[in-house]
Amino acid sequence: MAQKTNLNINPYYDDFDPEKNYQKVLYKPGFPVQARELTTSQSILQNQLESFGTNIFKDGSLVVPGSIAYDNNYYSVKLKSSNFGIDISLYIKNFIGKKIIGQTSGVEAKIRFVLLPEEDSRVDDVTIYVSYDTSGNDFSQTFFADGEEIICTENVTYGLTTINAGEVFASLNTADATSVGSAAFITKGVYFVRGYFINVSEQKIVLDPYTNNSTYRVGLQIDENIITAKDDESLFDNAKGFSNFAAPGADRFQIVLTLIKKDITDGDDTNFIELMRIDSCLLYTSDAADDLYRG
């Protein structure tokens, strides 16, 4: 599937037509170079890559190893919004990857992810997602206790402030503070999408913050963008000492792949590649993931 963005418009005028079988743009001395000719040169090469790629891969194929995963034991912990009068949302994300301990229970865990109320309408409290490492003081407690204070095993700095190891940095809600949510993950890789080989960054999404009885289609949302120097300052000319320094350069065509979830009844795949399907917490590999290569 070719890109959907039409570049044969002002100001790009990319009128490349594969039916004409033009394989090169032959620039000549004494003839001014047209902007469209520079763009068309790229389109000729892209058409060659797309023709080869389409012969090998189906749209949405994973080309360079990455992986998609589903976690239906994504342990959530709701925290009080402030600690000694300080809004914990100011610093809580600095604790991601850190080992924490419950002062009352003795339970140890590592913070994997943080979700704030302003980031997700389904969340009313600052919520951390943890992987539990050890049970508590009596070897029977496996989750943090409601209302208990938690400390970190190492110093954490935010701004000019340092929270020292062993200091209380947050407290759990007094009731129903712990539960089990669900999440999906994708690791870094390259996917063949719309004739291009697109880098995908490592991403994660919380499917359901406090329950793991999830039912969704999970995959990649495709966004095509035109990026100008106003969007990305690195596109201003960096040739310091020359007359064109700091002038806006050429625009860029960009494709971004973002991990998202869709309702299982949503069949609109116009800008979506399904990678897996979850039905009542049961995982099913999508047809697209099962058969991504040409036979």
Spans of features found by a protein language model:
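Elongated alpha-helical scaffolds
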Residues: N47, I186-G241
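Surface-exposed intrinsically disordered loops and tails
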Residues: D133-D138, N173-T178
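Hydrophobic or amphipathic alpha-helical targeting/insertion segments
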Residues: F144-C152, Q221-K230, S234-I264
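Polybasic, proline/glycine-rich intrinsically disordered low-complexity segments
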Residues: I260-L282
